[in-house]
Amino acid sequence: MNHHVARPANTGILVLDYGSQYTLLITRRLREIGIYAEVIDGRSAQPPTDFTAAGIILSGGPDSVQDASARRLPAWVFALNKPILGICYGMQLLVEHFGGELRSGKGREYGQARLNLAPEMVGPSGALFYGMPVTQTVWMSHGDDVARMPQDMVAVGRSDDGVVAAMVHKTLAIAGLQFHPEVNHSEYGKQLLENFIRNVCRAAINWDSGSMLAATLDYIRESVGSANVLVACSGGVDSTVAAALLAKALGSERVTAVFCDTGLMRKDEVSWVANALKELGLNHVEVLHSEALFLNALSGVTDPEAKRKIIGRLFIEEFERYATGHQAEFTHLGQGTLYPDVIESAGHGAGAKVIKSHHNVGGLPEKLKLKLCEPLRYLFKDEARQLGAQLGLPADMVDRHPFPGPGLAVRILGEITAERLHILREADAVFIQALREHGYYHQIWQAFAVLLPVKSVGVMGDNRTYQMTIALRAVNSTDAMTAGVGDLPMSFLTHVAAAIVKKVDGVNRVVYDITTKPPATIEWE
């Protein structure tokens, strides 16, 4: 398998991943502030040779430093002589390295806590905490804590129960936090990260959509050369922006956009996608009608991971079949893989527990005949949207709600059948249309319907019914790493529920999912 991955910048903050599901959130916050940041495996034997770190952040993680098998700091981290900020497990690694001691806490501390800083740390001499309140709310998630401070470090912040929550080195630009500044619940976390960039690393704030676009276009031209590219399009924002980037960089004549109709699309999706791609100026748009192939392969399959693997495998096989069956010599396969896709599939090899496989990165065969070109692999969803706007894509395309690569297969719990797909398509269409008509569509980051494997008793007229249940989900997010519940009025939800039951045969009950991410993921499977 050949990965051609665009690195949009060659300098910034290097984030070492020790298995935390918040790792990419650190990266996202840094980019929001205006500096490029990149994640590598915390166990890497050496730093990237083509990336200059202005500073280093050590992520949290599920390990205990007291375990012999726990991941440790590589020696090169200190040899680089760059500022270091350890977060949670990252702080505990620093405690161990400098000769301190850790202990297992009485219980895992998870949730909001109060941080009490030493007053001198928020003044001009306290670069990391400059301008912040002495007392503030932070987000804790740890099992171990400091039993004895290293001689070279000083505790500058504690929680209300006396746990060391912040420490700094006496002479070096090294600090540790026992809380997560990257999480929104840490009320001054973003300011702290900006202080680390500006005051500690002395790094430039120069990361924006303009630099993203220029670097990505340059990379595509350099990596693809004079070859032709086959772009795998799903109709979502990611693959559409990837196709537009490739066409912009190479010229539309060298780019063929292929949309695989898996039979797992939303209502009227196929015609909408084909027309949208042509409106982008792409001269070569092909639709592969593969519905029967996918439905046959998914027959009887109920495990969500198995569904994703099957879809991912067939997805690639269909594009390979198309490429080898045509005279044009495609050497590259373009995909809209995003950074969160990679991290949720543990694609960095950093040991983060796999939450779910993504069809772009989890179902690829080991011997892929086409070289992968993934222009968005280092970018987040909102950054992809920014690039789309920069390229002049229509707002209704750029601002379209995210849609998973496996399509409705991960929104049908249980077996996939033509009948169940029809029910879900119709229910989802009612929900989305209502959001648009009532002006809520652009207030919500993502909304969709889910078909549950549950039937319930109902009554219609004088007759008893025993029919399917639809769950509605609406969330707000910026990067898909965390998500809050969409604040839709109960009157609106009642209206949608009534409309679905009335218009969609086979459904007699509608429920609303009010779970955040975490603990849930956005999609149900």
Go through each PLM region and give its residues.
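Active-site loop/oxyanion-hole signature of alpha/beta-hydrolase fold enzymes
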Residues: 69-73
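RNA-binding accessory domains that recognize and position tRNA/RNA substrates
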Residues: 1-58, 62-68, 78-80, 96-327, ...
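Short alpha-beta junction capping motif
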Residues: 76-90
